[in-house]
Design a protein with these regions (language model features):
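C-terminal alpha-helical interaction appendages
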Residues: 25, 35-133
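N-terminal cationic leader/targeting segments used for protein routing and processing
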Residues: 15-16, 41
Length: 133
């Protein structure tokens, strides 16, 4: 079995870090044979057998760790877009995002914001701060 970091690398290396894939990863973990087929349908692409086996063999705790790693990677992407859009430093963008209601909702799984793509979250943040961009 591969480590959590190897699994995350496999996922990101295959450019699967998009809203639809994150929605599946964030869903409650149900080890079953149809998990692989659901994963393929959601991502619209086939994965190599090693990646599929690794995803299916995760414990619930490991599954949660993968979800959290992906969430933090997404925050980095969102912060870069905030910096570019508003013309502020990365540090300022990070500070702005972490102090926002949008960030709070992004971490709260009950709101469903984490299921949306990075640009959707960015637009929510920009609307929250009243940016005309």
């Amino acid at each position: 079995m591969h480590s959590i970091s190897e699994i995350v690398f496999q996922l990101t290396d295959k450019n699967l870090l998009m809203g639809r894939m994150v929605a599946l990863i964030e869903s409650p973990f149900e080890p079953s044979e149809d998990y692989v087929e659901r994963y393929k349908r959601v991502t619209d692409m086939s994965l190599d057998q090693d990646t599929v086996k690794n995803l299916n063999n995760l414990t619930p705790e490991q599954h949660r760790k993968v979800r959290n790693i992906i969430r933090w990677q997404r925050i980095g992407c969102i912060v870069v877009k905030i910096s570019e859009t508003l013309g502020v430093s990365l540090k300022e963008a990070l500070d702005m995002f972490y102090r926002s209601e949008t960030c709070r909702r992004f971490h709260d799984e009950e709101t469903g914001l984490y299921l949306q793509g990075n640009l959707y979250v960015l637009n929510d943040f920009l609307a929250e701060i009243g940016s005309p961009v």
